[in-house]
Amino acid sequence: GAWSFVREDCYVMYPEDNLSLVRLELEADIEYLVVEGAVYLYKTTGDDAWLKKVLPKLEKGIDYMMSDEKRFDKEHGLVKRPFTIDTWDFTYLPDAGVNRRINPNSPMSIMHGDNSGVYQAMNQLAWFNRRLGNEEKAREWEVRAEVLKGNIFKHLWNGKFFIHQLHLNHNGLDNLENERLSLSNTCDINRGLTDTEQSRSIIQEYMARRERTDCFAEWFCSASQCLLQVL
């Protein structure tokens, strides 16, 4: 089972039900997706009592992503993960099929989609707090979101779209990361990270690459690969 792919602190066993809950250690999208799920549930039910109960745990999850050495790169002020394809849950290493751990020598990188997800979650936590009358706490989350946004654009925006990965302790597999258009660019738009012109720039890049490549998807290729297809 998937529990064998991770460390003991990343799963909970329920032998009486023959079930396990597993957090694939290398994934960096769990906490912000839980916040997003809570937004959908709250908008459906309007249950303020439930929100008061779960909000501290939701905030704890995002605080963890923004502080734990395993998850956060202090130098860039951004969330990190092992080097995967965009938001996928496996690396390029030979044991990727059975190893979803973060090891001391794991190749670590910063992926824009993880950070836009945390950015959205911070604004959602602000909205939650404001719904409960916690204006000061709401503003704190909004300020933190703006700081994160600044770091995202400083380190990951190439003027046209967000680069695939910013490598930290390794050099990657090629020199194309700055021009590789990965699928989470569209998620970045939907999460409110980009303004109108930035959103238009991302969409135009997708459209241009579709015209220049016969790859199975326009976000799969780098700009140079698209050019090779034309030549």
Language model: regions and residue ranges:
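Alpha-helix boundary/capping detector
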Residues: 84-91, 171
